[in-house]
Amino acid sequence: MKCPVCGISLTYHKDINGLYCHFCGHKEPMPIKCPECGQSALRLQGAGTQKLEEEIERLFPDNTYARLDLDTAKRVGVMDRVLASFAKRKTDILIGTQLIAKGLDFDNVGLVGIISADSSLNIPDFRAPERTFQLITQAAGRAGRGDLRGRVIIQTYSPDNYAIKAAAEHDYEGFCREELRLRKLMSYPPYYDLIRLIFSGDDEKQVAKEAGDWYESLNEMIHTGFIYRPQPAPVNKIKETYRYHMMIKCPRGRRGLFLGALDKLNRENNNSKTRVNVGIDINPYSFI
């Protein structure tokens, strides 16, 4: 089921027994039957922190545990209390998201389990392997900080992926060599600058037309680099606002040429009566 306001999939949350949009906060009750086919045999799947909490409770009934994620951490004082309890060994098992993967120093962690370690590889972002390697390395670094040797278990469907293998082997240099080789081959940073244009507005047809007009104009003005046709953004709609994006790969040293052309088009857009907003992001950190 998708959010009627944002157009993205809703996420089930056990604490409200309902569906929740992480972009706009829209909530819906858990459906009794499928809204498409009418079948009532609905089954919850996935390996989120709430599901892990259920499994921990079932498998380790004699151990104490706590969960730390965005849902629990936003409550005042919860994060400090949970971490203090774990540090004092009053809590045996700490379940969490990336919140607990870095920046924490406990001398009593003997085992770290990284669930679905390859899930970040599926994000449409050229930095996905780097972020996967970074996350595994940081999470693994929580184990074995005291006198006892730590152990790390990585769950993955892609054990042969170079980012997963390098992280498991603590091979930073090997990962870096392969990552830079692929980025050079695909004309990604640091060999090229990446410029992302984001077009947004409340009329999808107008947003798509404006993006197409910019694409045509840029191709007439510039004859170097790579200018890709605009497409709906991975998250195409947020809070009733439609979003398209266009990617440009700019050779190093030619950024000024592209920025000059974009500045000209942006001034023309500001002087027009169009209701489409245009954002320009150089070497963006997110492509969502």
PLM segments and residue spans:
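Structured alpha/beta or helical-core interaction and ligand-binding surfaces enriched in interleaved
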Residues: 227, 252, 261-265, 270-276, ...
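A carboxyl-terminal module marker
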Residues: 216, 220, 225-239, 278, ...
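Inter-lobe coupling/hinge segments of SF2-like helicase ATPases
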Residues: 1-198, 203-208, 245-248, 252-253
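A short, structural micro-pattern
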Residues: 146, 191, 240, 272-274
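Short, intrinsically disordered low-complexity segments
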Residues: 229-255
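Short amphipathic alpha-helices in soluble, non-transmembrane regions
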Residues: 210-216, 257-267
